[in-house]
Amino acid sequence: MIRLFCGHDEREAIGTHVFISSVLRRTSQPVSFLPLNIKGMQRDGSNAFIYSRFLVPWISGYKGTAIFADGADMLCRADIAELWDLQDPHMAVQVVKHDYISQYTRKYVGTSMEANNESYSRKNWSSLMIINCAHYAWRKITPESIVDMSGPDLHRFTFIDERYIGMLPFAWNHLVMEYPHSQNVKIAHFTLGIPAFKEYRHCPFAGEWQDEVREVTRHIDANYE
């Protein structure tokens, strides 16, 4: 069973449903989903799961492996089992190691979520993770300890020895509008804003995202007219 924790924010709830649907329609293995939104962990105007993602090992009893994906602003275009098969038991965490400066100074433009889009070291590394919950490096991360840690320390994995931060292929966390368009993308990450928002309605992969919305709602439309 693939365990997949995905971010959920009520302000872009449709995005969570789209992501889950896109995973389920393509997976070759059973998937267990846990939308993640732990109250009280949000410290700023960012999404509701910005810090709670680091509690996945604690939630899991420091056992097994799990995937965390931002989810609410992602579209899965491949079999999630392919990602699951990339897990390395020697690593504490595996991520796509982005190294970029954003082309955009604002994100979620035109919505109540609109905010500055700051560039910083290891930006978006934590937005897609294969987490080895049993690795000793995670033992220091608890609901109590996380309160005293800064956002940058968490998102840059300063609590994990560099040797135990593994690399995943870029196709599994493609930053839409930041990276050149490619049809080989496995997970499209609408990090600036999902196509439900007017500003991003025609961005790359928006058509596929909107097709997934129709897939999510078509049975409702047919059965509850």
Regions found by a protein language model. Name each.
Residues 39-43, 101-103, 173-177:
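A short acidic, often aromatic-flanked loop/helix-cap motif at beta-alpha or helix-coil junctions
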Residues 52-104, 130:
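GT-A fold catalytic core of metal-dependent nucleotide-sugar glycosyltransferases
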Residues 13-21, 51:
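Short amphipathic alpha-helical segment that frequently serves as the phosphate-/nucleotide-binding helix
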Residues 12-13, 76:
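Alpha-helix N-cap/loop-to-helix initiation residues
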Residues 22-30:
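Short, acidic, metal-binding catalytic loop of nucleotide-sugar glycosyltransferases
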Residues 31-62:
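Active-site-proximal specificity loops/subdomain of glycosyltransferases
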Residues 1-5, 11, 17, 28-29, ...:
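A glycosyltransferase accessory/donor-loop signature
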Residues 85-153:
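Conserved catalytic core of nucleotide-sugar-dependent glycosyltransferases
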